[in-house]
Amino acid sequence: MTKSAELYEKAQQTIPGGVNSPVRAFNGVGGSPIFVERADGPLIFDADGKAYIDYVGSWGPMILGHNHVVIRDAVIAAAQRGLSFGAPTETEIKMAELVSEMVPSMEQLRMVSSGTEATMSAIRLARGFTGRDKILKFEGCYHGHADSLLVKAGSGALTLGQPSSPGVPADFAKLTLTATFNNLDSVREIFAANKGEIACIIVEPVAGNMNCIPPVEGFHEGLREICDQEGALLIFDEVMTGFRVAEGCAQAYYNIKPDLTCLGKVIGGGMPVGAFGGRKDVMQYIAPTGPVYQAGTLSGNPVAMAAGYACLNLLREEGNEKRLASKTKQLANGFKQLADKHGIPMLVHQVGGMFGFFFTDQETVTCYEDVTKCDVERFKRFFHLMLDHGVYLAPSAFEASFTSLAHGSKELDATLEAADRSLAIIAAESK
């Protein structure tokens, strides 16, 4: 038994499922999860000392690579001054100014400690600002584990929310309406049936929680138009896409100005940080300037702010955005070429520093229904073959993968070599 397997067995005695976030348990791919001991650059090292080229990147934050010396030094320096004050600091101001400069739609912003806090707070703010209770999200899009966002209503239940998790009251869930991603007609139908009742649309500009699905042409423009017509707010959940798709986030990449934006992951440089912000007139509704209450003991934590500030300053250095996108495109194209070589149907998507691949013969994958038609069993086999070859992909067919600026040609070549071998095995097994 490996040390990872031993640790997993031990963890299950005191931690539900042995993990502190479900996807880490490898339920989506089978087998026992690897337990990580340390990480450096593009690599993670498990408890048995084996190295893996990492394309999970702590689920997105490690855009500069693991254990970056500048971020590490910033954290150490901040920690030496104190771990938490529960009072404002100058670093919070500098951080807010930097984010607002990089993402101009965020005229004002509030720091929180996670992406879930960011989306939860933005939803409350949208409801308070508009005086409306209902919200609209998209099937297959994930916005954190707040009750109002843990709703997945599809097919015949587009206008009546239903809990996708026990513990979400059915009556409460009815306030969350669910449309089909990349389908403006479904959005218009919901607004028509709920005239003057919808506070906001919340959307992942690139859907990264059903693998990686970019918007079809005109989708975000249509959402912006509908919100303007209906008096609803448009919220971009950029927890995953923020600073990864482009320096100015996905909203800059697609040239769309949302009313509110939610950030997480990259903004903390590996530390627990989230933020939400947007139009000044909307943000003024947040306490203490307005009636919508939001607070947090660790919001604006000085150590986390130091990490995030260092990360964003490094990230915005000239050429980094193009370098990251180029690396990711090379990898995504390589996967597709190798799949074609071995006669395995595969569809690959890539936007900036995130990518995803689907084992499918569909010509397009644009929504959750399309994703469910993909070959999950083949993905599981590919995942474990790649893991055996020292490549760590997202352990779920429904999650995006990420590159970092630390991934060099050596790692990319080794990854594609592993993919070539893995796909060859799958092709042979399919005969």
Swiss-Prot record:
Pfam families: Aminotran_3. The keyword RNA-binding does not apply. InterPro entries: 4pyrrol_synth_GluAld_NH2Trfase, Aminotrans_3, Aminotrans_3_PPA_site, PyrdxlP-dep_Trfase, PyrdxlP-dep_Trfase_major, PyrdxlP-dep_Trfase_small. Its main location: cytoplasm. Homodimer. Transmembrane segments: none annotated. This is Glutamate-1-semialdehyde 2,1-aminomutase. Belongs to the class-III pyridoxal-phosphate-dependent aminotransferase family. HemL subfamily. Gene3D superfamilies: Aspartate Aminotransferase, domain 1 (3.90.1150.10), Type I PLP-dependent aspartate aminotransferase-like (Major domain) (3.40.640.10). It comes from the Bacteria. GO terms for molecular function: glutamate-1-semialdehyde 2,1-aminomutase activity; pyridoxal phosphate binding; transaminase activity. Its EC number is 5.4.3.8. Pathway: Porphyrin-containing compound metabolism; protoporphyrin-IX biosynthesis; 5-aminolevulinate from L-glutamyl-tRNA(Glu): step 2/2. The keyword Isomerase applies. Keywords: Cytoplasm, Isomerase, Porphyrin biosynthesis, Pyridoxal phosphate. The modification N6-(pyridoxal phosphate)lysine is found at residue 265. NCBIfam families: hemL (TIGR00713), PRK00062.1 (NF000818). Its cofactor is pyridoxal 5'-phosphate. It is found in: Cytoplasm. The gene is hemL. SUPFAM superfamilies: PLP-dependent transferases.
